[in-house]
């Protein structure tokens, strides 16, 4: 971390650190994970917290105050780290630090799938006032943003994917009621696992949605195999008569991947540092071509 970066982080800490008397002695370390270098571990005065800075041109759905409210509800159920402070004006979020692991390989383990399914079953019934996550709305938003970009020239493949996403989104919205408090961004980097339980971070895309949306996010964004997808369905729904079939989950996974692809394409145009987003779009594009 450069001196300029440290000065920027410390200035942000002065706005949210609970103990003004120790903030100048706080040790700061950049944390990995995610698409942007914006999270920092801050240790001092007997405290260990994570500071998250805003990203210019952010693609986040919720504002930081709404995100903090959603995360606090999850934390009250021990499903997320506690929110320590939020500064809506500066876009800052300070949360408790949990020394837990996350790796793409870890979320593929059978025991991890069991833990995450248990976590989602506990998260989804929580009564949190959040906007409804409509797939048709997000599809239209991303495609409209791209269409307004002078440098964007979609080929036949992207036009076909856009039509497919619109169709899948309409079907999903009309077929599955938004009954659950969904996280909607279940990349491995947003899932913390300690061997006994799983917890979630980064609730920027949280909203009311169908439980199947979170299952598709988890399976699609972490490249679950067919066997892992079936285990996820079995762990979440058990013997419920109305449980979706594997084909239903696979269609939702395809939809989530298409949405993430166009999200990445919009980010390429909007963000100044979008290399990771470009790589994501390219990776998802390769997966989509496989069917």
Regions found by a protein language model. Name each.
Residues 212-241, 254-272, 285-287:
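Active-site activation/catalytic loop segments of kinase-like enzymes and analogous catalytic loops
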Residues 29-136:
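ATP-binding pocket architecture of kinase catalytic cores
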Residues 85, 101-162, 170-180, 205-209, ...:
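A cross-family kinase active-site recognition segment
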């Amino acid at each position: 971390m450069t001196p300029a970066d440290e000065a920027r982080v410390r200035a942000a800490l002065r706005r949210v650190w609970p103990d003004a008397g120790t903030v100048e002695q706080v040790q700061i370390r950049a944390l990995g994970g995610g698409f942007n270098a914006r999270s920092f571990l801050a240790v001092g005065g007997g405290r260990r917290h994570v500071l998250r800075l805003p990203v210019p041109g952010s693609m986040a759905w919720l504002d930081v105050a709404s995100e903090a409210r959603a995360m606090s509800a999850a934390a009250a159920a021990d499903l997320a780290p506690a929110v320590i402070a939020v500064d809506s004006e500066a876009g800052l979020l300070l949360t408790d630090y949990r020394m837990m692991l996350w790796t793409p390989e870890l979320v593929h383990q059978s025991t991890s799938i069991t833990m995450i399914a248990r976590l989602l079953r506990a998260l989804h019934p929580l009564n949190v006032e959040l906007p409804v996550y409509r797939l048709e709305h997000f599809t239209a938003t991303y495609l409209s943003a791209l269409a307004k970009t002078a440098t964007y020239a979609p080929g036949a493949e992207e036009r076909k994917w856009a039509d497919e996403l619109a169709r899948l989104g309409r079907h999903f919205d009309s077929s599955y009621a938004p009954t659950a408090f969904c996280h909607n961004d279940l990349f491995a980097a947003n899932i913390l696992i300690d061997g006994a339980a799983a917890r979630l971070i980064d609730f920027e895309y949280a909203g009311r949605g169908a439980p199947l949306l979170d299952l598709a996010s988890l399976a699609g964004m972490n490249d679950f195999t067919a066997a892992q997808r079936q285990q996820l369905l079995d762990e979440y729904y058990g013997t419920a008569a109305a449980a979706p079939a594997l084909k239903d989950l696979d269609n939702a996974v395809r939809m989530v991947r298409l949405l993430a692809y166009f999200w990445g394409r919009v980010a390429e145009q909007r963000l100044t540092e979008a290399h990771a987003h470009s790589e994501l779009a390219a990776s998802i594009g390769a997966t989509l071509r496989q069917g």
